[in-house]
Amino acid sequence: MDYFRLAEKFLREMHAKYMKRVSRPGNTPRPWFDFSEERLLSRLFEEMDELREAVEKEDWENLRDELLDVANFCMYLWGKLSVKNIYDKGEEQ
């Protein structure tokens, strides 16, 4: 499997995890818009702690799941910072 196919599979898994999370009542479909940088960082660190626990327990199935959570929160924070940068420069979306 080449890099592109691996990245595509990972992105599909991230999206499935995202959809599972945002379909719950009360969850926002756009955390990169609706949450502050501080809240996104806090949630990212929580997910990293859960990832660390999965590694320590050698729980490989849960480790895969936690990697998706960390990746999603990295993307949400990246999106927040990117959108903020666009607005700070006065550019359109």
Swiss-Prot record:
Source organism superkingdom: Archaea
Name of protein: Uncharacterized protein AF_0060
Keyword Coiled coil attributed: yes
SUPFAM superfamilies: all-alpha NTP pyrophosphatases
Gene3D superfamilies hit by this protein: MazG-like
Residue stretches in coiled coil: 36-69
One of the Pfam families matching this protein, by short name: MazG
Keywords tagged on the record: Coiled coil
